[in-house]
Amino acid sequence: MKNLSKTEIAVMTGKTIFQNRIKQADRAAMGKSELLIKKSTNVKLGKRVTKGKWKGFPIFTLTLEERATCPRSCAHWADCYGNNMMYAFRYQAGPELEAMLETELAELQRKHPNGFLVRLHILGDFYSVGYVAKWAKWLGMFPALHVYGYTANQPDAADATERSIGQALLSLSDNCGSRWAVRFSGNFNRATMTANSADDSRAMAAVTAKQAFICPTQISKVTGKYAAKGEETLVPDCGACGLCWTASKPVVFITH
């Protein structure tokens, strides 16, 4: 009898492969200076926005547990890039996380009153309507807060829980202006604020028709094609691009 692999078990149970990299949002379980919302050290994201109306904003990130907080309908449920992120800490969803996030956002508001940008989520997704409502509340509480990211929760999902989360996110997008730029991943029913994979022919057809754009951080500055590792790209990072939070057209990502 064949034993299931760690990946197969994680996919089946809806958890991360790396259970030893999950942390509770609890001061006793975290390092003395450890924060949930971390300064970006990701070369693909950049450390701050260097172009456009948000120029100068420092970039921060939040990482939750993949699959445990995601809808099962996600196209990358099985091949999530979190499968290769064995060093990333994932924070457990729930009231403790939300309480600590509010405290940290208050401090970021104090430190960066002119604006800061939070990328949601490096791993994981919006796990409840209540959690979405908290972000709506925080946008009201902290005027310097700006958010961008992606969600697999669809407003027209067949699953009622996913649909309610997706509709809450859509409502937030419709009512919060440019400060909330969360795109719906794998959605071909909407003409704006989506993020799709180049593996899908519909995405590339939209690019050809100039109804979508390929992420400039993935395109070689020399060849105009997908950039090889180490090759200079059209823009070096998200902070130097800004299209995901300034453009409404769908963005297309090349799977890597």
Show where each model-derived region lies.
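Class I S-adenosyl-L-methionine
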Residues: 1-256
